[in-house]
Regions:
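Residues that mark transmembrane-helix kinks and helix-interface sites
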Residues: 20-28, 51, 74, 81, ...
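Juxtamembrane helix-loop-helix junctions in multi-pass membrane proteins
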Residues: 1, 115-142, 190-196
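Juxtamembrane helix-loop boundary signature in multi-pass membrane transporters
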Residues: 48-111, 210, 215-237
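Hydrophobic residues within alpha-helical transmembrane segments
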Residues: 10, 14, 18, 45, ...
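Structural motif at transmembrane-helix junctions in multi-pass transporters
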Residues: 25-42, 125-131, 180-197
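Membrane-interface interhelical linkers
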Residues: 1-14, 24-34, 75, 82-104, ...
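Selected transmembrane alpha-helices and immediately adjacent juxtamembrane segments
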Residues: 98-125, 130, 169
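Alpha-helical transmembrane segments of compact multi-pass small-molecule transporters, enriched
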Residues: 42-56, 71, 139-143, 178, ...
């Protein structure tokens, strides 16, 4: 870590603040204003924003496979997210200002995540994945500690005992592993492809729905097929 470039540390640390501090805050606020489904759908513009930044600023190649694959993945995820759910229509002739604001916040959250992914790509160029991940996790832990201290209810660490403590530790370990794989994916495949592939997270809920006895809808099946086709295009392209 002694030879860790300061510019890399800056981009990696700032990426956490932009993604978690601003992006996640805007996203959770948008969910309160427009609801879960519409918030998820609008924030799903994240891969498109990332591809634009990656191509225009980071000079990553724009291939037909990436373009078509990203479109297919987003369409498939939208089908999965809307399966079995009805978008609640706003009563009255127009959408109120709160919903307009919520839509804007969801899109801004997606833009923040795109900027975060791009900053990670820049910051991780000249360092190894584990060191880069360590920087991001330390900054994230420090930021959460400060937020917890400033919170009216405080950190409340004493309530984490037994199963709660084990679950929290397990979640932390999984988060660390995911952070490593996410950063390595950006290093080896680029920001645009990584953003597209990581946006398929809702698809992993499909097998879980089978285990819990939920009924599969045609949107879920078609969405999964379309997304898998999109993933193949991105990887092959």
């Amino acid at each position: 870590m002694d030879d860790f470039p300061l510019i890399s540390m800056f981009f990696l640390a700032t990426s956490v603040l932009v993604g978690m501090g601003i992006g996640d805050t805007l996203y959770f606020r948008s969910l309160k204003l427009v609801g879960t489904v519409r918030g998820l759908l609008l924030s799903n513009a994240y891969p498109l924003f990332t591809a634009m930044i990656a191509v225009l600023i980071l000079h990553e190649p724009l291939t037909v496979g990436l373009l078509l694959g990203t479109t297919f993945v987003i369409a498939g995820v939208i089908l999965v997210l809307t399966s079995g759910r009805a978008l609640v229509k706003q009563q009255g002739p127009a959408i109120d200002k709160g919903e307009h604001l919520g839509m804007v916040l969801a899109l801004l959250a997606a833009l923040c995540w795109a900027i975060t992914t791009s900053m990670v790509k820049v910051g991780a160029q000249d360092v190894d994945g584990l060191s880069a991940t360590a920087v991001r996790l330390v900054v994230a832990a420090g930021a959460l500690l400060v937020v917890g201290r400033l919170s009216p209810v405080g950190l409340q660490l004493r309530q984490y005992r037994g199963r709660h403590l084990a679950g929290t530790v397990a979640a932390g370990v999984i988060t660390a592993l995911c952070s490593v794989t996410f950063l390595l994916a950006i290093q080896f495949t680029g920001a645009a492809k990584t953003a597209t592939l990581t946006s398929t997270a809702p698809l992993f809920g499909v097998p879980m729905s089978l285990l819990t006895g939920e009924k599969l809808t045609w949107q879920t099946v078609m969405g999964s097929i379309v997304s898998v086709a999109g993933i193949w295009m991105v990887v092959a392209g």
